[in-house]
């Protein structure tokens, strides 16, 4: 049960990190 929570937590963290990176890149591209 603990392993499943850790796995889902890291997956959602990675997805959030990717989303933030993509959003930041899009903002920089639009700013130019």
Curated annotation (Swiss-Prot):
<comment type="subunit">
    <text>The 4 large subunits of the cytochrome b6-f complex are cytochrome b6, subunit IV (17 kDa polypeptide, PetD), cytochrome f and the Rieske protein, while the 4 small subunits are PetG, PetL, PetM and PetN. The complex functions as a dimer.</text>
</comment>
<keyword id="KW-0472">Membrane</keyword>
<dbReference type="GO" id="GO:0015979">
    <property type="term" value="P:photosynthesis"/>
</dbReference>
<keyword id="KW-0249">Electron transport</keyword>
<feature type="transmembrane region" description="Helical">
    <location>
        <begin position="5"/>
        <end position="25"/>
    </location>
</feature>
<dbReference type="InterPro" id="IPR012595">
    <property type="entry name" value="PetM_cyt_b6/f_cplx_su7"/>
</dbReference>
<comment type="function">
    <text>Component of the cytochrome b6-f complex, which mediates electron transfer between photosystem II (PSII) and photosystem I (PSI), cyclic electron flow around PSI, and state transitions.</text>
</comment>
<keyword id="KW-0812">Transmembrane</keyword>
<dbReference type="Pfam" id="PF08041">
    <property type="entry name" value="PetM"/>
</dbReference>
<dbReference type="GO" id="GO:0009055">
    <property type="term" value="F:electron transfer activity"/>
</dbReference>
<keyword id="KW-0813">Transport</keyword>
<keyword id="KW-0150">Chloroplast</keyword>
<keyword id="KW-0793">Thylakoid</keyword>
<protein>
    <recommendedName>
        <fullName>Cytochrome b6-f complex subunit 7</fullName>
    </recommendedName>
</protein>
<dbReference type="GO" id="GO:0009512">
    <property type="term" value="C:cytochrome b6f complex"/>
</dbReference>
<keyword id="KW-1133">Transmembrane helix</keyword>
<comment type="similarity">
    <text>Belongs to the PetM family.</text>
</comment>
<keyword id="KW-0934">Plastid</keyword>
<dbReference type="GO" id="GO:0009535">
    <property type="term" value="C:chloroplast thylakoid membrane"/>
</dbReference>
<keyword id="KW-0602">Photosynthesis</keyword>
């Amino acid at each position: 049960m603990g392993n499943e929570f850790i796995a889902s937590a890291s997956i959602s963290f990675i997805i959030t990190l990717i989303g933030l990176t993509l959003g930041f890149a899009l903002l920089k591209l639009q700013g130019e």
